[in-house]
Curated annotation (Swiss-Prot):
Limits of the PRC barrel domain: 94-166
Record's protein name: Ribosome maturation factor RimM
Record remark on domains: The PRC barrel domain binds ribosomal protein uS19.
The species this protein was found in: Borreliella burgdorferi (strain ATCC 35210 / DSM 4680 / CIP 102532 / B31) (Borrelia burgdorferi)
Subcellular location: Cytoplasm
Superkingdom per UniProt: Bacteria
GN (gene name): rimM
Biological process annotations from GO: ribosomal small subunit biogenesis; rRNA processing
GO CC list: cytoplasm; ribosome
């Protein structure tokens, strides 16, 4: 499952939710129509809903969920993340990766395992991989100057700059 967006507010009088896209690609949201998604929020329960309509107006994205027909019904869902099945995740271009799928990958250099990706975080316009080496943790910028080949078959990520693990 992948997070695809976050509910920001209600919109209109018919129960539409204004959604922020995580991927910034609105076109992929069209595929959600007539599919079920999972709405999740930390420290709260999750709810499965069916998307019955997708509406894109300018730079805004609106979703209509089955049996949610008023702004009042949408308001408790504000802040919920929209999770979708892998088959409905945004398509990737060559060289793009779902960061969550990189968790568990080995960090290697010259085919020697140095550590393992345990998490990632995004800060401003940068992504960092959190890597465990023994009992220590390091943050590696997810940039081509530091990261080399990513082998999805062997689940390895080449580290070009070993000094990042000191």
């Amino acid at each position: 499952m992948f997070i695809k967006g976050v509910i920001l507010s209600s919109y209109g009088v018919n129960g539409y939710a204004r959604v922020k896209s995580i991927s910034n690609n609105f076109c992929d949201f069209i595929n959600l129509k007539n599919n079920k998604v999972l709405l999740k929020k930390s420290n709260s329960s999750s709810v499965e809903v069916k998307v019955v309509d997708v509406n894109i107006k300018g730079n805004s994205l609106f979703l209509k969920f089955e049996e949610i027909d008023t702004p009042e019904a949408v308001r408790p869902l504000i802040g919920f993340e929209l999770w979708v099945d892998d088959s409905l995740a945004s398509s990737l271009k060559e060289g793009e990766y779902y960061l969550g799928k990189l968790i568990g990958y080995a960090i290697v250099n010259n085919n020697k395992k140095l550590g393992e990706v345990v998490a990632f975080f995004e800060y401003l316009n940068s992504v960092f991989l959190e890597v465990r080496v023994g009992i220590k943790f390091f943050f590696i910028p997810f940039l081509s100057i530091y990261i080399g080949d990513i082998n999805t078959q062997e689940k390895t990520i080449e580290l070009k700059v070993l000094d990042l693990l000191k």
